[in-house]
Amino acid sequence: MSFYTKDYSKRMTLIAEEGGAQLYEYLPSAFKLLAINFEKPRFVRRMRFLLEYLHRGHYKVYYLAVDGEFVGHCVVTPGGRRLSVSTKKDIVLGPYFVSPEHRGKGYAKVIVRMTLEYCTYDYECAYDWIHDDNYASIKTSEACGMVKEGTRLNVVGLMRKLVPSENGDNIVYKYVRK
């Protein structure tokens, strides 16, 4: 099930096509933080996106459509903010999400790979952090050329701050742009 906003097309641009897959870039506004929600957004996630939009500059959301149907999204934020190992020359991926009815078809790999290749940020490295028991996301990131960076994180507090920790249960992955 998708939770669509009334009119997202004004802020969404087609940026790449490969076969039957299309990658769209969405520029959020304070009132439309996501164009399409594939899951009912939790309050904390909405607040994090709103704070990112208001206080830290803009983030972008990349939507994957396959044969004209939206199947998932990948949020991209500038680096040097929430994830301490990133710099202002980097980007941070996540969350990325594929709707339940489209899982198991390789779309997560497609959206991450296309986002890394076609996103409009000028970046040197891309980072992602993944809970160490999220094997599907680990496999997706590694298949897209991301490697373990070595840093482990804990996600703490209401706003889910990322804190480096030797015993952290999240693994940081890094992709170096070619």
Indicate where each model-derived feature is located.
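A conserved beta-strand-loop-helix scaffold within acyl/acetyltransferase catalytic domains
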Residues: P41-Y96
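Residue-level recognition of the GNAT/N-acetyltransferase active site
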Residues: S99, H131
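Conserved GNAT acetyl-CoA-binding A-motif
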Residues: C119-I130
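Conserved active-site alpha-helix within GNAT-family acetyltransferase domains
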Residues: D132-G150
